[in-house]
């Protein structure tokens, strides 16, 4: 399902830190299946400020830290179960090792999917030291960058220091190799946007690291994500924007 031939060292940039854009990861049919069945079950609201960044979005576990099976697999479509199986495969880890030059086989993996609805965002930050490398996939079939919700590669902690903006379109993905300078953010989703920004973060941790998304003893209530405008409403909104530009 994932085109692992695209995982080559040449895909990584050295500026402003080690990161890379990898596109065209799925065939049209697989991409359509993943977009059409993006998970809505077992989400929790993630919101706060941790001393470095502010954040607000909805998150669901796809693969728990160090697990060998998908989370809540009975609620996943066939396409999403296949994707989870590929992420758990030795072939995917080998491709990540080839891409980054790091030994992904010895790292602990966690995978979460997210909906970013209106006003959702993730402020400028560098990842925690426990995170070695993160691979972010996107699952929107269309997206207006004016609606925000785009991963922003930064050259410093200031949101204005933009190096690259990546829209969350199906087949797009970004690899971030953690460093003291690996600043990035997700721009706020515009309040008038009713199509969630959909992503999946595959994070490789140092062995023995705890999950910050799902800490031990976490009792946060889970819910079905319902913050979505009906298809006709989305179409009408797009037509209105085209008319008013």
Predicted regions and their residues:
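Substrate-binding/active-site groove segments that recognize
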Residues: 135
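Proline-centered turn/helix-capping motifs that create local helix->coil transitions or kinks
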Residues: 43, 104, 141-145
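A short coil-to-beta-strand element that immediately follows conserved catalytic motifs
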Residues: 103-112, 147
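Non-heme Fe(II)/2-oxoglutarate
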Residues: 9-99
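Conserved short histidine dyad/triad with adjacent acidic residue
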Residues: 114-127
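N- or domain-start disorder-to-order transition segments that initiate the globular core
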Residues: 1-8
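Localized chelating/binding microdomains
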Residues: 12, 20-22, 30, 38, ...
């Amino acid at each position: 399902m994932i085109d692992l031939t695209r995982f080559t060292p040449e895909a990584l940039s050295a500026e402003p830190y080690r990161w890379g854009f990898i596109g065209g990861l799925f065939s049209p049919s697989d991409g359509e299946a993943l977009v059409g069945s993006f998970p809505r079950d077992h989400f929790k609201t993630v919101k706060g400020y941790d001393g470095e960044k502010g954040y607000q979005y909805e998150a669901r576990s796809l693969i728990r830290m160090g697990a060998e099976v998908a989370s809540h697999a009975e609620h996943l479509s066939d396409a999403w179960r296949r994707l989870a199986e590929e992420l758990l495969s030795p072939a995917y880890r080998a491709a990540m090792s080839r891409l980054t030059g790091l030994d992904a086989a010895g790292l602990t993996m966690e995978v979460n999917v997210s909906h970013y609805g209106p006003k959702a965002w993730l402020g400028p930050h560098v990842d925690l030291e426990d995170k070695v490398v993160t691979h972010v996939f996107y699952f929107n079939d269309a997206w207006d960058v004016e609606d925000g919700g785009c991963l922003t590669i930064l050259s410093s902690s200031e949101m204005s220091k933009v190096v690259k903006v990546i829209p969350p379109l199906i087949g797009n993905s970004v690899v971030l190799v953690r460093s003291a300078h690996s600043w990035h953010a997700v721009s706020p989703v515009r309040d008038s946007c009713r199509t969630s920004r959909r992503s999946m973060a595959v994070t490789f941790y140092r062995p023995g690291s705890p999950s910050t998304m799902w800490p031990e003893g976490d009792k946060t209530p889970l819910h079905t994500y319902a913050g979505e405008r009906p298809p006709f409403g989305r179409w009408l909104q797009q037509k209105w924007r085209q008319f008013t530009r």
